[in-house]
Amino acid sequence: MIRTIKDLYAHRRLLREFVVRDLKARYVGSSMGFFWSVIFPLLNLAVYFFVFRLIMEVRFGDKMSPEASAMWMLAGITVWTAFAETVSRSTNCLVENSNLIQKVVFPSEVLPAYLTISSLINMMIGVPLVLLGVGFFIWRGEAGFVEVQTASLGAIDGQILDPGPDRTLRWGVSMLLLPFLMLAQGGFTLGIGYFLSALNLFLRDTYHLVGVLVTFWMFGTPIFYPVQMVEQARGGQFAFILKVNPMHWLIESYREVLLFGSWPQLHLIGPFVGVALLTFALGSSFFRSQKDRFPDLL
């Protein structure tokens, strides 16, 4: 893990060039350019809000307005989109850049890394949408967030946790926690990216399988519905999903910071940081152990 970090730092200029190139290439030829970073989450929100809130009538509490629930969904969609995009693109990044790996001495660990950083930057472009929505509800005096906070951030065993004044921060101060959450998210995502990109060279079907697994993972994460639906489904048979789902821990931590201006709950962010470190260590180690075989496998 340490060697990978040192290598990335040693090639930081190349890494930066790849990130800049990727950000520019995302919307090349588009008249709206980077505005798609804002529009795309809104379009996704419109689809999922229509399906889950209006058609399926998923409720987040009697006092939760449709507008407030839309902001709650948007916070989750923004984080998940960055994660899913990175995992999907990283899986096939070595194959797509085989010409670089085969012909020159190229630091291949840069490839999953620049995709991770690019997606995080793209995610941060969409974060102001959430903050603007929160500012609107504060200005309007919307109280619906209070109920969804105590409802969706309850303990995994089903007991509701009162956020309490001791955990409440001003929104401006809570924004200082975003870099920490992004760093943890980046480590977790990059670890997965390193593992899957190397595995895909041995099993080329990995890339296709990942798309299905990511979709299943998305619907198994409380992004479009409250936690209680998982805890109460079939008498609580699926409550274990919350206990083993790191993305649930991460998304709820982001919601605490973005929507409520609060500290992330320790029983959520603590395990996520541990899993992120372990995932990055294992993923980068597997990647490095197979690195010398990449040219032959390609």
Locate each region found by the language model:
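Hydrophobic transmembrane alpha-helices and immediately adjacent juxtamembrane helices
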Residues: M1-L298
